[in-house]
Amino acid sequence: MMAAFFFAFFVALVLSDGTTGTTASVMTMEARIYDDADLSQFYQLLETSQVANNTLTYRHVTVFAPTNRAFQKYNGSKSNLVLYHMSNLPLTIERLGLSVSSELDGNPPLWVTRKPGPTGEEEVFINNAKILKQHSNFQSKIKVNGDTKTQVLHVIDEVLEPVRSISPESPIYNPDAFQFINQSENFNMGNHRVRTFRQRIVIEKKEGIFTADGRYTFFIPVDEGFKPEPRPQKVDHLVIDGHVIPNHILFTVPTPENVYYETLVFSDNLKVTVSFLMEHNKVYVKSNTIVGDASHHTGVVLAEIVKPNIPVRNGVIHLIQRPLMVIDSTVKDFLESFKGIEKEDGPVYKFYETIRDFGDDIMTTINRLHDVTLFAPSNAALEEPGVQHILQDKRRVKEILNLHYVKQRLPLEKIQNKSISQAQAGIPTAADRKKLYFNVVQGPAGNQTITVEGGGVNATVVTANIAATNGIIHIIDRVLGVPYTTVLDKLRTDPMLNSTYFLGQRRGFNEQLNDTTKRFTYFAPREQAWSGANISYPSTIKKLFMQDFSYHTKQILERHLVVADQVYTMAKLREMSINESVTLTSARDTLKLRVKELSESYQIEWEGKWIRVFRHDVECTNGIIHVIDGVFLKDSDVRVTGDASLASFAPHLIIFLIAKWLL
């Protein structure tokens, strides 16, 4: 009833002859909001605010109106909330600057962020709320005592939440970051307290960086994150600087992931950057000490943002779970930090859960090691159906878990080093005779992607260099050792097998390798194997790569492929050929091999030649690949391939001669 009265009264003003001192265009701001059913909750706030009504009646204004869906997600106070969504300047999207003063007491700023959208169009945010452009830039004009007042409406997808003082005796309006920290008990922060960090700021005399005018992003650790006890003393003046990003106001939604921002501690002697990470609807912040010193070690520290997007006069504050830059936890401590119901969507919680359920002894072993690198699969990787199936096999799970750590420190910089990423021998893991192999892929923009292969599975490092006192943790996007590709897909995507894949495309040889009803054992020559064969048989290899000789290429590849009702691991082949050769049925004829084990690798003998198995037991969903350092070529192949055109023409010639004789 009241809404109808309010609307009728306002329309009367619109249609008046000017005696009230106010006239307007056909549709006023208030009428536009009233007319939009998706803004009904915001309209209710307008109705109850006399100040907002007066602003709409007499003044220039820009209104940021949250949708009803935005209010459904909002559980904060609505007292005077509407004034924080209004500014006394009429600003279209194009005219929005870096900030806008709101009409709330103290005129706290609303911060503006512009960023490119997924399709290239510009997106604009007010604090953490996105402006819905298709519903925005509505303008109306009213006349007040002869002056024209312009009013602009923007619709946003999130309610803007101001900093509110809960002390009626001494209210605080529009605080800067230090006022917020210093008077944190007087603000609504839920159960979070920041006394310890405040104490460190005062002791280190760093108040100035939190009171300075400008545009800053502040990360404030809560008291809970300062355990165990020695941790507070490690937060010195440089660590405090590492919690502040200058010249950027970074709210969580508009800030892209994995973009590195320089902190206040960024000099020749010490360099620290900060970036954001999203995981299961939680936001994490990562400090990366790129250049360290004796007191500040290199590496990444990961902290959950427990209360984000607190706007202050000189920027934005995020309350975080623990201090950045402080490396005082073991690898085991890092994994166990995700214990508890509230941590079950932490970035590697499911991996921790798997170790807890299947590999307690592995956790004990890792904790004893002074130098360890753990490759921890993300939650999404462990949710894959193929992984869930394997989790039923306890023995297999233990073997897979052992594949995910090595007994040395491998920070990203060391992996990027050619000697590691191109190391032919691989890096031994805790799994029996299993190694990890690394590859550095250069992106078009100069960025590098690091991949790790273990048990035939290629995984990408998505979060690197999480530092611990006894090692490094890298978060990867797949579970190593759990096949998810067919033999064909593995050939297609592994750069080491490019030539073998290329040759197999001739005459449809590769097509069979996608058949999941069969079990393949493929002795696949790697790139260096073809290069070596080119030295021994230059003419033959040259012809094999020519289309005219594809018939012979297919025959030679068939010699490398065993199709059976089972796969043959190198351990199984070694067992089968302890005292004699083993004969397998290849796709072409028979394949007679002997196998011997040397240290942690294997060699196979074929036709009197010993060939090293460069990488054994690369598992696929329909078979297994043994990457070998040689090609199964015979002298007779050289003679036969001497004239491929004759071989392909011979059957036609015989038929022609028989037909002629019969006639």
Descriptions of predicted regions:
Residues 3-7, 13-663:
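Mature, structured domains of secreted/extracytosolic soluble proteins
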